């Protein structure tokens, strides 16, 4: 079933794939990395003025990485604002996705966390560096194929 935003994107010739609706009835769309920046700008102009959250996950061992964006249209006098979930998949070998920092400033720390944990590079992000792990950390801890370093000391329980 195609949602309202998906129908609008089709009408305007914008390439995407509808993934249906989540359990709350929020429309979910898949956008290719090369199309994401231009569609993000269009969504902002269309009224999706709030990036509620951005996260990322490892789809499967050796598979794709996903960056997920939850956008909301906040309008005066509207009790139930329209929401959409956008998923952008990137190859594990060189995961690059355009940053939306310049569209929604709230993407700053969220994209940095996704970079730090999964190694997704957000092109044009002004400060893309580790935010949780030390700068010297090797690897991406939330990837399913991550092998934890063998240097942790077991602390005495006393």
From Swiss-Prot:
Lineage, uppermost ranks: Eukaryota, Viridiplantae, Streptophyta, Embryophyta, Tracheophyta
PROSITE patterns: COMPLEX1_30K
UniProt similarity note: Belongs to the complex I 30 kDa subunit family.
Any one Pfam family match given in the protein's UniProt record, by short name: Complex1_30kDa
Listed name of the protein: NAD(P)H-quinone oxidoreductase subunit J, chloroplastic
Compartments, record wording: Plastid, Chloroplast thylakoid membrane
Keyword field contains Plastid: yes
Statement: the UniProt record of this protein carries the keyword Amino-acid biosynthesis: no
Example of a GO MF term: NADH dehydrogenase (ubiquinone) activity
Major place of residence: plastid
Known catalytic reactions: a plastoquinone + NADH + (n+1) H(+)(in) = a plastoquinol + NAD(+) + n H(+)(out); a plastoquinone + NADPH + (n+1) H(+)(in) = a plastoquinol + NADP(+) + n H(+)(out)
This enzyme's EC code(s): 7.1.1.-
InterPro entries: NADH_DH_suC, NADH_quin_OxRdtase_su_C/D-like, NADH_UbQ_OxRdtase_30kDa_su, NADH_UbQ_OxRdtase_CS
Membrane topology according to the record: Peripheral membrane protein
Keyword entries, A-Z: Chloroplast, Membrane, NAD, NADP, Plastid, Plastoquinone, Quinone, Thylakoid, Translocase, Transport
GO CC annotation terms, alphabetical: chloroplast thylakoid membrane
Swiss-Prot/TrEMBL GO biological process terms: photosynthesis, light reaction
Subunit structure comment from the entry: NDH is composed of at least 16 different subunits, 5 of which are encoded in the nucleus.
């Amino acid at each position: 079933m195609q949602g309202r935003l998906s129908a609008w994107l089709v009408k305007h010739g914008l390439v995407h794939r509808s993934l249906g609706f989540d359990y709350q009835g929020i429309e979910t769309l898949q956008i290719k990395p090369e199309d994401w920046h231009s569609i993000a700008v269009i969504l902002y102009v269309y009224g999706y003025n709030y990036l509620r959250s951005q996260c990322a996950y490892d789809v499967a061992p050796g598979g794709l990485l996903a960056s997920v964006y939850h956008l909301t249209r906040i309008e005066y006098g509207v009790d139930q604002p329209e929401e959409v979930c956008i998923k952008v998949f990137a190859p594990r070998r060189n995961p690059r996705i355009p940053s939306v920092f310049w569209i929604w400033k709230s993407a700053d720390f969220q994209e940095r966390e996704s970079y730090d944990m999964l190694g997704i590079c957000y092109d044009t992000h002004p400060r893309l560096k580790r935010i949780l792990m030390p700068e010297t950390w090797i690897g991406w801890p939330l990837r399913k194929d991550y092998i934890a370093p063998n240097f942790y000391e077991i602390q005495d329980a006393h």
